[in-house]
């Protein structure tokens, strides 16, 4: 099975880390790819790509620069993404597309409007990572949320995320507590006990 994780950029972030941890899992018969929507350019980007490649995850870099100046650039990326995704679909034929955060959500929604027939055999999964979706963008939310609800694609990462989603959009999302690797707590030698 071929699974594609779509993230905003190859950079440091909670959703990016969850996608990376899932993609790096050594699940038998699973081929993982990770696709960035906007090109990451931080000091962490190269480390992220190296980590993915060492784990056998195929990385698909974006040509669209990540400009943090205004949300309009994410909208442009979403409009242009269907052409890039067309190539990915025709070349790789993913069985599952797993989106993380609003920018990838917009991109797959846009792709589904242009090329719905290419998604007929592909399962869409969407992880909701936070309690506030589409802050300041209610018109975009009113277009995109019904798509993910209709496709039964939503998965929340916590009770609070799922409760917030149900309160705002009226739909239930199952909870899956995965994608976060367990880290052993280190003892801090200078801790003062009182």
What are these regions (language model features)?
Residues 5-75, 166:
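N-terminal strand-loop element at the rim of the active site
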Residues 160, 179:
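Carbohydrate-associated surface elements
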Residues 99-109, 128:
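Short His-centered aromatic/hydrophobic patch
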Residues 2, 95-96:
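Structural motif
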Residues 73, 89, 118-155, 163-169:
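A conserved, positively charged/aromatic
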Residues 89, 93-95:
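Proline-aspartate-enriched helix->loop->beta-strand connector
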Residues 98-99, 156-157:
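Short beta-strand scaffold positions
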Residues 47-50, 185-194:
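A short helix/loop element that forms part of the nucleotide-sugar donor recognition site in Leloir-type
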